UniProtKB/Swiss-Prot annotation:
Biased composition (Acidic residues): 16-29, 46-56
Domain of life: Eukaryota
InterPro entries cross-referenced by the UniProt entry: DUF4637 (IPR029174)
Organism: Mus musculus (Mouse)
Designated name of the protein: Uncharacterized protein C17orf50 homolog
Pfam families referenced in this protein's UniProt entry, alphabetically: DUF4637
Biased amino acid composition, Polar residues: 65-77
Skewed-composition ranges (Basic and acidic residues): 1-15
Any coiled-coil regions, as ranges: none
């Protein structure tokens, strides 16, 4: 603790040599013996005055508030300092550590990338031998149904199943038959 009663952080304290401490103790003991002999020679009133003065000073210090802010480094700065001071086996990796900081930090608030429109993506062939032009697809981006531009024309006039029925000449058969399996998915979305 310093004279104001504030704890000093360990990283602020200076390391003293044991030899220097011994020299200080010797200097203190020689100066205290000379000062004690001077005090003995002076009268007792001056000794009590100095004691009272020191007590008054201590009381004033106890009543006063001193502000001594502690300087703290962020954890990233501490890590950087530790990396710089580390000259062991991993010291040769320091160029790679510097390159790691160049990457842009990921934006966690950004959600998943938006899905492209069904019309913009390449579609795979329909299942069970269905007709690609007869498909109606729901687009998550547009939130609507998409179909081929010639959907109606193709399904009514060009569809191979309907063409076979017309070739037989039974128009009643067309009306009474359920839709073919290829086109049935159009009605059950």
């Amino acid at each position: 603790m310093d004279k104001h009663g504030v704890k000093t952080p360990l990283w602020r304290k200076e390391v003293e040599d044991p030899e220097a401490r011994e020299e200080d103790l010797e200097d203190d003991s020689s100066s205290s013996s000379s000062s004690s002999s001077v005090e003995e020679r002076s009268d007792p009133e001056s000794a009590t005055e100095t004691e009272e003065d020191s007590r008054d000073a201590e009381e004033r210090e106890a009543r006063s508030v001193s502000y001594s802010p502690l300087r703290q480094e962020s954890s990233s700065q501490q890590v950087a300092l530790l990396r710089r001071s580390d000259s062991s086996f991993w010291g040769w990796l320091s160029p790679f550590a510097l390159l790691g900081g160049l990457a842009a930090p990921a934006d966690r608030k950004r959600g998943a990338p938006e899905e492209p429109c069904v019309l913009e993506t390449r579609r795979r062939p329909p299942r069970r031998g269905g007709c690609a032009r007869c498909e109606i697809l729901f687009c998550k981006k547009c939130k609507t149904l998409h179909s081929h531009p010639a959907y109606v024309e193709h399904c009514i006039l060009e569809h191979p199943d309907l063409g076979k029925a017309e070739a037989t000449g039974n128009s009643e058969l067309i009306d009474s038959q359920p839709p073919s399996p290829q086109c049935s998915k159009l009605f059950y979305l």
